[in-house]
Amino acid sequence: MGKIICTGLGPGNPDLMSVRSDRLIRTAAHVAYFRKAGRQGQARRIVDGMLAPGVTEYAMEYPVTTELPFDSPAYIDVLARFYDHWADRLAQVSQTADVVVLCEGDPFFYGSFMHLYTRLQGRAAIDVVPGITGMTGCWHATGLPITWGDDVMTVLMGHAARSRS
């Protein structure tokens, strides 16, 4: 029996990936990753050149991204079916082999894997490897500390405004 291993890739530079993530990716026989329709996918791009020959890839292609408002019933329904489908597929593969799911940043910080994680509870063995978040990479790139001493930091989620053509 295998398991589903979601590994955080960090902010986009393979040098900022954990040693454990690197090892899991290089030895994986099955790798899954999210992507927009017709694109390679950012997570897949980050690991380019790291995958073993003959690896089986599962491109989890989003059925919609920004075409519908994220809070509309149609968007919620389409994505729920998408995540249900991929939870089923990954659970099936994990019955006989490990599957490494690639996740940009950290899987539990606004990561798409969270939607699979909740659906896979009790159906498959799951392991999650943390990654450096994108925002952490950003503030380190500035060379300035983001907080000092008793500072409080708040993270707010936001979406880009839709184009008004």
Describe each region flagged by the PLM:
Residues 1-14, 19-21, 26-125:
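Class I S-adenosyl-L-methionine
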Residues 105-165:
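Class I SAM-dependent methyltransferase SAM-binding "motif I" and its flanking Rossmann-like core
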